[in-house]
C-alpha cells in the first residue's frame, strides 16, 4: 500500500545550464516537484521558462556539447536516473518513459510508413515478440488513437496534422509507458483538432493508467487535463498546487495573475486582454532577487534584493515576498513600481 502512494516521478532541486565558450545560460534553477501515479501534472509558463529543458533532463536527452545537469535528483520509481548508465537509460526511454514533442513532423520519418515506425519502437523494446505479434500490436495501438489499422501502410505526408499527432502519440504509447511527457502536444494544431487530441489523451490516460507530465503555456489545456500544476518562470517554479488551487484560490503569484489576465473572457465584451509587460530576463544575467521583479506591478524593494521563500498552506505553494508571513509581520518592503 505504501508503494502505491509513492510518486512515480520526483524531481528535487534540479539545476540545468547550457554552457558555451562565451556564456552560461541558467535554464533551470533548483526546481522540485513530483507526479503521483496515474495523475497528470501541468508545467506551465512562457517560452524560455525552462519547461522543455526539464523534460529533456528527465530523459537525459540534453545536447551533449552544451547541456549540463549541475545538480539535483530525478527519481523515477525511486531510482535516481542521473546515476544510471546509458544502457539502462535506453531501457527507460520510449519504454517506461515516453515523450510526445510539439511538431509531429519532427518525430516522423517521411520515407517510412507509419506502421514501420511504430513497429520499430515496439521491436526495440520488445525483441521477444514475433512479427505477427508486432503487427497485431500496431493494429491495436492505431485503433486506440482512432486511426484505421489499414492506414499503417501509408506515409506521414498522407496524414493531416491532427492525424500525424495521433500517430506520434501511438508511437509513444505502443510499449505502455508508466510516464508520458507531452511537450506542447497541440501547439501546431487548429482549435477543433486540438480539442479532439486533448480528449483522446485524457481518455487514453484513464484507460491505460499512465501518469503524465503536460508541458504547455495554455491554462485552458491545464484546466481540461491536469490534476496538479506548477507555474514556471525563468527556470524557477513560482507557484504550485492542485488544479483547484491554481484556478480557485483567492491568492496567486503575480506572474500567474498575468497569465490569467492574458486569457480572452468569452462571457463579457468589456474586458480587454491584459498582457504581461516586458520580456523574460536574460538567462545569462538573471536578477539578483525575484526573477519576475522587473515585470511585476506589485514589486517591492525586497523583491529586487532577495530571492523569495516558499509560502502558502497545504497543497498550494507560492514563491513570492507578498505572501511571506515574516514580511507581513515586520512590514518590510514597499512598492517600487507605483
What name fits each language-model region?
Residues 181, 185, 189, 193-271:
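P-loop NTP-binding/switch modules centered on Walker-like glycine-rich loops
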Residues 81-98, 124, 246-250, 281-287:
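ABC ATPase NBD coupling module
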Residues 7, 242-338:
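Short catalytic/signature loops enriched in Gly
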Residues 174-178:
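A short, proline-enriched helix->beta-strand linker immediately N-terminal to the Walker B motif
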Residues 76-80, 132-150, 257-261:
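Conserved ABC ATPase "signature" region
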Residues 154-159, 163:
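Conserved ABC ATPase signature
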Amino acid at each position: 500500500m505504501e508503494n502505491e502512494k509513492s510518486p512515480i516521478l520526483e524531481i528535487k532541486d534540479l539545476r540545468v545550464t547550457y554552457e558555451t565558450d562565451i556564456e552560461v545560460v541558467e535554464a533551470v534553477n533548483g526546481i522540485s516537484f513530483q507526479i503521483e501515479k496515474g495523475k497528470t501534472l501541468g508545467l506551465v509558463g512562457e517560452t524560455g521558462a525552462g519547461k522543455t529543458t526539464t523534460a529533456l533532463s528527465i530523459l537525459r536527452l540534453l545536447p551533449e556539447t552544451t547541456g549540463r545537469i549541475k545538480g539535483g535528483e530525478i527519481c523515477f520509481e525511486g531510482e535516481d536516473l542521473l546515476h544510471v548508465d546509458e544502457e539502462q537509460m535506453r531501457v527507460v526511454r520510449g519504454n517506461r518513459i515516453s515523450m510526445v514533442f510539439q511538431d509531429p513532423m519532427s518525430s516522423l520519418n517521411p520515407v517510412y510508413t507509419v506502421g514501420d515506425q511504430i513497429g520499430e519502437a515496439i521491436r526495440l523494446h520488445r525483441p521477444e515478440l514475433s512479427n505477427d505479434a508486432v503487427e497485431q500490436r500496431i493494429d491495436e495501438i492505431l485503433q486506440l488513437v482512432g486511426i484505421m489499422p489499414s492506414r499503417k501502410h501509408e506515409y506521414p505526408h498522407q496524414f493531416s496534422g491532427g492525424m500525424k499527432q495521433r500517430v506520434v502519440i501511438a508511437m509513444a504509447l505502443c510499449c505502455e509507458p508508466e510516464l508520458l511527457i507531452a511537450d506542447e502536444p497541440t501547439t501546431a494544431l487548429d482549435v477543433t483538432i486540438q480539442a479532439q487530441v486533448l480528449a483522446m489523451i485524457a481518455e487514453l490516460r484513464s484507460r491505460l493508467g499512465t501518469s503524465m507530465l503536460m508541458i504547455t503555456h495554455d491554462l485552458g489545456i491545464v484546466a481540461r487535463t491536469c490534476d496538479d500544476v506548477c507555474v514556471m518562470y525563468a527556470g524557477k517554479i513560482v507557484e504550485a498546487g492542485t488544479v483547484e488551487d491554481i484556478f480557485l484560490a483567492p491568492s496567486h503569484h503575480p506572474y500567474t495573475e498575468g497569465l490569467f489576465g492574458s486569457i480572452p473572457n468569452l462571457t463579457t465584451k468589456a474586458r480587454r486582454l491584459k498582457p504581461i509587460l516586458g520580456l523574460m530576463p536574460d538567462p545569462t544575467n538573471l536578477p539578483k532577487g525575484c526573477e519576475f521583479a522587473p515585470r511585476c506591478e506589485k514589486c517591492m524593494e525586497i523583491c529586487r534584493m532577495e530571492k523569495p521563500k516558499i509560502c502558502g498552506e497545504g497543497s498550494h505553494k507560492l514563491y513570492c515576498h507578498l505572501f511571506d508571513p515574516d514580511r507581513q509581520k515586520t512590514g518590510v518592503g514597499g512598492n517600487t513600481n507605483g
